[in-house]
A protein has these predicted regions:
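Acidic, glycine-rich active-site loops and adjacent beta-strand->loop/helix elements
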Residues: 72-77, 144-151, 172-178, 283, ...
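Hydrophobic, small-residue-rich alpha-helical packing segments that form membrane-like cores
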Residues: 119-144, 148-195, 204, 232-238, ...
Length: 400
């Protein structure tokens, strides 16, 4: 039996489908991801969560003419399936196979290759600036996970994008997780935003009334309307960080409702200036094991898709990570001044054991390696003995 997915070799093929066929395609993509990753392993959790978003982006935008920039690539497996790499997908992360991340040399649809989180906004702004310098008209979209919003680089990009007033779209994929649960004020702010469509409707009505009343009451009504609009924003969306940075905000939107996603992206595509679409997704969507243990299923080796168990059970000695975590926890019992610091990876660094036993002495600062190291330095000046556990490749951003 021919599947919808097997007929799609490019975004043009996807656009030939009717909208009512897209949910069926989404299920086929999830089945394909679960099947292939059970053999190759991979970052399946986030990719399962953005299946509908991937479909909607390719359905409403014109990649590779429009530039879609995915942050990191952990989210981009469905993107690969829909952009001509379905047949190659069983070679994911294998020697001679396709990359587990986005790779410009692999596809014209992979606009930017990166291993660090937080780069998409700045890269997208660079592309939008280049477009304007060359007098071109295409759209530029940055897809950023809420985990990357714990990254200072994301805000450097957003700050410059809002100030530039360039035509650029930021899509926030909000699943409440990066690798481990997100931390910090930004994560809490996203969690407080109210999903109420009355916000944008009311703001548009205020603008309409302003123009109608200007002729009667003069320019003073414009200032009054602006104050009312500001109050509306704060009432429905506490904080409104994005609007303060110069972005027009839309959302939150159910990231698994294809009709709503397509309608919203089509509407936002027709606008200009910096704008942000806040999309709520579930990490591991459609795979019960990944839904129930999102941290474990962020990325893992081969597994049995029926039981969720690893295909190869280790019967050997403990790993270096396990030894490190156990040793650090043992030392903490003897040294009350010892604390642990990590950057969004307690499980990956082995410090989750320390976290469970000494939560008040454990600090997960999110995807903020530079802050982690400097924060640890501040602790050390006051007689505390911090152990800062970060993957070596991520530590590159904190050398200074």
């Amino acid at each position: 039996m021919t599947t919808l997915l097997s007929t799609i070799h490019s975004p043009e093929d996807l656009k030939r489908l009717r909208r009512d066929q897209l949910p069926e395609l989404a299920q086929e993509i999830r089945d394909r991801l679960i099947e292939c990753c059970s053999i190759t392993g991979g970052h399946i959790g986030a990719s399962l969560g953005v299946v509908e978003l991937s479909i909607a982006l390719l359905y409403e935008f014109d990649s590779p003419g429009d530039k879609i920039v995915w942050d990191v690539g952990h989210q981009a497996y469905a993107w690969k399936l829909l952009t001509g790499r379905n047949e190659q997908f069983p070679t994911l992360r294998q020697e001679g196979g396709i990359s587990g991340f986005l790779k410009r040399s692999e596809s014209d649809h992979d606009q930017f290759g990166a291993g660090h989180a937080g780069t998409a906004m700045s890269a997208a702004l660079g592309m939008a600036t280049a477009r304007d310098l060359k007098g071109e008209q295409h759209k530029v979209v940055a897809v950023v996970g809420d985990g990357a919003l714990t990254c200072g680089l994301s805000y450097e990009g957003m700050n410059n994008a809002g100030h530039s007033e360039r035509d650029i779209i930021l899509i926030v994929n909000d699943n409440g997780m990066s690798i481990s649960p997100n931390v910090g004020a930004i994560s809490k702010m996203l969690g407080r935003i109210v999903a109420d469509p009355r916000t944008n409707r009311l703001r548009e009505r205020i603008k309409g009334m302003t123009f109608a009343l200007r002729g009667v009451f003069g320019e003073g009504v414009v200032d009054f309307a602006k104050n009312v609009e500001e109050s509306v924003k704060n009432l429905f969306s506490p904080g409104m960080l994005f609007e303060e940075l110069g972005f027009r905000y839309f959302g939150p939107i159910d990231g698994h409702d294809l009709q709503k996603l397509c309608d919203t992206l089509k509407f936002v595509r027709g606008m200009t200036g910096p704008r942000v679409v806040h999309v709520m997704t579930q990490k591991g969507k459609g795979f019960s094991f990944a839904e129930s243990n999102q941290e474990k299923w962020h990325g893992l080796a081969a597994y049995d898709p029926v039981t969720g168990e690893a295909r190869k059970k280790s019967s050997g000695p403990p790993t270096w990570t396990q030894v490190f975590g156990a040793g650090l926890t043992a030392l903490a019992a003897e040294h009350p001044e010892l604390v642990a610091v990590t950057a969004a990876m307690p499980s990956g660094t082995g410090t989750s054991v320390f976290q469970e036993k000494y939560p008040e002495r454990f600090f997960d600062v999110g995807i903020a390696e530079g802050h982690a190291v400097t924060f640890a330095g501040g602790l050390a000046t006051q007689g505390i003995r911090p152990v800062c556990a970060i993957y070596s490749t991520f530590l590159q951003r904190a050398y200074d």
